[in-house]
């Protein structure tokens, strides 16, 4: 099963979710993309720090979401606006959800970009919780 995480720039939330998911569910394929990503950019310094501190899977360089990405089995966005943009550009999709929506929770993963280390830690903790719930659903 291929699961794609999507955020805005593919430098904070979605690559962090990808790294966490790869550690938690090594038998599934995970990738990440950004709606407005500039290709081949590294993740933010705080994301790098968190990946190293928690011994997570190495992050990949940023990639912009394209029509080819619709081939993923499940596409999980960090916010409603990401989901809406995918549907506006590519039509209504029955396999695109917000991460919160997929695990039956309300809310969105707030973008820590430009914020403090504490904001990134909060995002990391939220993603761990959501991805553990995702594991319960798909495994």
UniProtKB/Swiss-Prot annotation:
Active site: 7, 13, 111
EC annotation from Swiss-Prot or TrEMBL: 3.1.3.48
UniProt-listed Pfam families: LMWPc
Reaction equation(s) it catalyzes: O-phospho-L-tyrosyl-[protein] + H2O = L-tyrosyl-[protein] + phosphate
Superkingdom, taxonomy of origin: Bacteria
UniProt entry tagged with the keyword Hydrolase: yes
CDD domains reported for this sequence: LMWPAP (cd16344)
Keyword field contains Hydrolase: yes
Enzyme class name: hydrolase
A GO MF label: protein tyrosine phosphatase activity
Listed SUPFAM superfamilies: Phosphotyrosine protein phosphatases I (SSF52788)
pH dependence: Optimum pH is 5.7-6.5.
Alphabetic keyword roster: Hydrolase, Protein phosphatase
Temperature impact on function: Optimum temperature is about 40 degrees Celsius.
Activity modulation: Inhibited by N-ethylmaleimide and sodium orthovanadate.
PANTHER family per UniProt: LOW MOLECULAR WEIGHT PROTEIN TYROSINE PHOSPHATASE, LOW MOLECULAR WEIGHT PROTEIN-TYROSINE-PHOSPHATASE ETP-RELATED
Annotated family: Belongs to the low molecular weight phosphotyrosine protein phosphatase family.
Protein task: Dephosphorylates the phosphotyrosine-containing proteins.
Name of this chain's protein: Low molecular weight protein-tyrosine-phosphatase PtpB
Taxon lineage: Bacteria, Bacillati, Bacillota, Bacilli, Bacillales
């Amino acid at each position: 099963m291929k699961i794609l995480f999507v955020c805005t720039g593919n430098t904070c939330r979605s690559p962090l979710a990808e790294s966490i998911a790869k550690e938690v569910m090594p038998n599934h394929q995970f990738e990440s993309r950004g709606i407005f990503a500039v290709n081949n950019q590294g993740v933010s310094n705080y994301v790098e720090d968190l990946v190293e501190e928690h011994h997570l899977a190495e992050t990949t360089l940023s990639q912009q979401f394209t029509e080819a990405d619709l081939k993923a089995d499940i596409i999980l966005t960090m916010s409603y606006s990401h989901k809406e943009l995918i549907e506006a550009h590519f039509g209504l999709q029955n396999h695109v959800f917000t991460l919160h929506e997929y695990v039956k929770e309300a809310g969105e993963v707030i973008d820590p970009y430009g914020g403090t280390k504490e904001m990134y830690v909060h995002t990391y903790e939220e993603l761990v919780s959501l991805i553990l719930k995702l594991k319960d659903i798909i495994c």
